[in-house]
Amino acid sequence: MDMNELARRVKEASIVLASAGTELKNRALAQIARSLQDGREEIIRANREDLLRSEKENLPGPLLKRLKFDEAKIQEVIEGIHSLIELEDPVGRTLLSTELDDGLELYKVTCPIGVIGVIFESRPDALVQISTLCLKSGNGVLLKGGSEARETNRVLAAIIAGATHKAGLPPDWIALLETRSDVGEMLKMDKYIDLIIPRGSNEFVRYIMDNSRIPVLGHADGICHLYVDEDADIQMAVKIAVDAKTQYVAVCNAVETLLVHEKIAPAFLPELKKAMDARQVELIGCPRTRAVIPAAPATEEDWRTEYLDLKLSVKVVAGLDEAIGHINTYGSGHTDGIITRSGEKAARFMDYVDSGNVFWNCSTRFSDGFRYGFGAEVGISTSKVHARGPVGLDGLVIYKYRLIGNGHIVGDYAGRLKTFKHRKMNKDYGIVTK
């Protein structure tokens, strides 16, 4: 089918989906979970084909690991769907209600964005997570997965479309794109697609951001920092730094640079070195760091590097303000934390660091939609427009203003026959239809 026609159908179906009630959407999600359960053998067979072909094509080990979609992964996404059903519907919430004048009421009410274009690499579980989040939030979705997962993605998209159709929704709300050229076309389709969400490597996300006509929600880099203040608990700081770096290194919320106050450096750095050596972490330090512990020499480029590996840059700083300046200069606006006993310093850090997630005395690895209680996430945004940080259901809705009157005209107010009252109401939007 022509791609424009495919996108047009998704757009049309998204309008129907946007008006679907919570009960219908949850029924469709439950049907998806049942259909995934029933289709386990077909899914695993398709995934085995993808794995065998990708091994022959010498796909790197980390990508092969992400590509694998076995019994455990299927069960995981099914459990995720059941958790999603339990979450509050983000659509139809009244954010503001104002009586402009007698009988003239204004409501600001959440609504779906429209059609989401999602471009992702390797992970078939991302297809299920993102499409079900789009369904719950009332959005149509155009999906472009990596060619390495094409058989698995075909089966999953067909199962999801069939399940939602069975539940009473139009199947065209979801569509799968398969060819590489589809990505370029997709990025030009601002007539049909309202938001692009890329999931993949830094280079991949940067390419999408640089070549899209459509707003992009995501992040290209995850250069996360921890700052160890002069009055930090040393054992706490070591424990947090180890977790933030090594709990899972190949993720965007792993710490890449550690900033250390000069007064605590002589006591803290040897303890850090001992703990990181035990986990095979290579330390890369500034001259002041290397005066205290052995470390590879850091260059200017190291402060801008997302390693996604067992490497950690370390810099000794004069104090809190230098740490904040460093983070705002070299950071990516993702997640940054401070370790200190001082509430005053923590507050200053959280106010002045220009990032979507700012933490006090805890690991950067907590920056995650599931850990925040969002159920799941479509990604993490470092943007300051619309959504920021881990993006769950709330990040997939926008709002519309609904004004209800009874023959009101602007001429009466322009001519001063009437004046506005602008009274705040504690009232949810609703129209009696019977």
UniProtKB/Swiss-Prot annotation:
It is found in: Cytoplasm. Its EC number is 1.2.1.41. SUPFAM superfamilies: ALDH-like (SSF53720). GO terms for cellular component: cytoplasm. GO terms for molecular function: glutamate-5-semialdehyde dehydrogenase activity; NADP binding. It holds the Pfam family Aldedh. It catalyses: L-glutamate 5-semialdehyde + phosphate + NADP(+) = L-glutamyl 5-phosphate + NADPH + H(+). Pathway: Amino-acid biosynthesis; L-proline biosynthesis; L-glutamate 5-semialdehyde from L-glutamate: step 2/2. It is an enzyme of class 1 (oxidoreductase). It comes from the Bacteria. Keywords: Amino-acid biosynthesis, Cytoplasm, NADP, Oxidoreductase, Proline biosynthesis. One of its GO terms (biological process) is L-proline biosynthetic process. Catalyzes the NADPH-dependent reduction of L-glutamate 5-phosphate into L-glutamate 5-semialdehyde and phosphate. The product spontaneously undergoes cyclization to form 1-pyrroline-5-carboxylate. Belongs to the gamma-glutamyl phosphate reductase family. This is Gamma-glutamyl phosphate reductase.
